[in-house]
From Swiss-Prot:
The keyword Ribonucleoprotein applies. It comes from Ruminiclostridium cellulolyticum (strain ATCC 35319 / DSM 5812 / JCM 6584 / H10). Keywords: Ribonucleoprotein, Ribosomal protein. Gene3D superfamilies: 4.10.410.60. This is Large ribosomal subunit protein bL35. Belongs to the bacterial ribosomal protein bL35 family. One of its GO terms (molecular function) is structural constituent of ribosome. One of its GO terms (biological process) is translation. InterPro entries: Ribosomal_bL35, Ribosomal_bL35-like, Ribosomal_bL35_CS, Ribosomal_bL35_sf. The keyword ATP-binding does not apply. GO terms for cellular component: cytosolic large ribosomal subunit.
Length: 65
């Protein structure tokens, strides 16, 4: 069976944890930050986990991570 290619955009956006969960960055923190509260910006610094519904799809995109 041939090697699988890793999806380049996905390998930059997702990280697989030691337990197998997929971590992603939070949206809402790229531009127009002056109008957002300090609390909101601080909250979105942390990552979030991918939902169970999308996890299988993303694992196919990054097979070797």
């Amino acid at each position: 069976m041939p090697k699988l290619k890793t999806h380049s955009a996905s390998k930059k956006r997702f990280r697989v944890t030691a337990t197998g969960k997929i971590k992603r960055g939070q949206a809402w923190r790229n531009h127009r930050l002056i109008s957002k509260s300090r609390k909101a910006k601080k909250h979105h610094r942390l990552g979030a986990y991918v939902s169970a519904a999308q996890e299988a799809t993303i694992k196919k995109l990054i097979p070797y991570k």
